[in-house]
Amino acid sequence: MSGGKGGKVGSAAKASQTRSAKAGLTFPVGRVHRLLRRGNYAQRIGSGAPVYLTAVLEYLAAEILELAGNAARDNKKSRIIPRHLQLAIRNDDELNKLLGNVTIAQGGVLPNIHQNLLPKKSAKPSASQEL
């Protein structure tokens, strides 16, 4: 009788693969699963739930970072700052709806001048007004 897992002696053991690697994700599936279990959201957590939630979180992070990177490039900066995150989120309709109640520290406000405060366009008098 041999101890262990019953394989051939001296055979290479299969390297373990994380759930993140199996799903092709960068964010940690195991950590999300642990946080779901310890967060008292439900008594039981299915095996697919943390994978799906991790994929959603990774997608949202990638989307926000891409838009913030574009905002940084538009401002001729190479580093993303909170202002770029604010501009990225507030200029995107869906992200603004999702994060409408979120305050970003050091984010500032969107530039906006009310129409009534803009100077009036000077129109040349037309022939119909001269009667």
From Swiss-Prot:
It is found in: Nucleus; Chromosome. The record marks 120 as: Not ubiquitinated. The modification N5-methylglutamine is found at residue 106. Coiled coil: none annotated. GO terms for molecular function: DNA binding; protein heterodimerization activity; structural constituent of chromatin. Belongs to the histone H2A family. Core component of nucleosome which plays a central role in DNA double strand break (DSB) repair. Nucleosomes wrap and compact DNA into chromatin, limiting DNA accessibility to the cellular machineries which require DNA as a template. Histones thereby play a central role in transcription regulation, DNA repair, DNA replication and chromosomal stability. DNA accessibility is regulated via a complex set of post-translational modifications of histones, also called histone code, and nucleosome remodeling. One of its GO terms (biological process) is DNA repair. In contrast to vertebrates and insects, its C-terminus is not monoubiquitinated. The nucleosome is a histone octamer containing two molecules each of H2A, H2B, H3 and H4 assembled in one H3-H4 heterotetramer and two H2A-H2B heterodimers. The octamer wraps approximately 147 bp of DNA. Keywords: Acetylation, Chromosome, DNA damage, DNA repair, DNA-binding, Methylation, Nucleosome core, Nucleus, Phosphoprotein. The [ST]-Q motif constitutes a recognition sequence for kinases from the PI3/PI4-kinase family. Phosphorylated to form H2AS128ph (gamma-H2A) in response to DNA double-strand breaks (DSBs) generated by exogenous genotoxic agents and by stalled replication forks. Phosphorylation is dependent on the DNA damage checkpoint kinases MEC1/ATR and TEL1/ATM, spreads on either side of a detected DSB site and may mark the surrounding chromatin for recruitment of proteins required for DNA damage signaling and repair. A motif ([ST]-Q motif) lies at residues 128-129. This is Histone H2A.2. The modification Phosphoserine is found at residue 128. The modification N6-acetyllysine is found at residues 5, 8. It comes from Candida glabrata (strain ATCC 2001 / BCRC 20586 / JCM 3761 / NBRC 0622 / NRRL Y-65 / CBS 138).
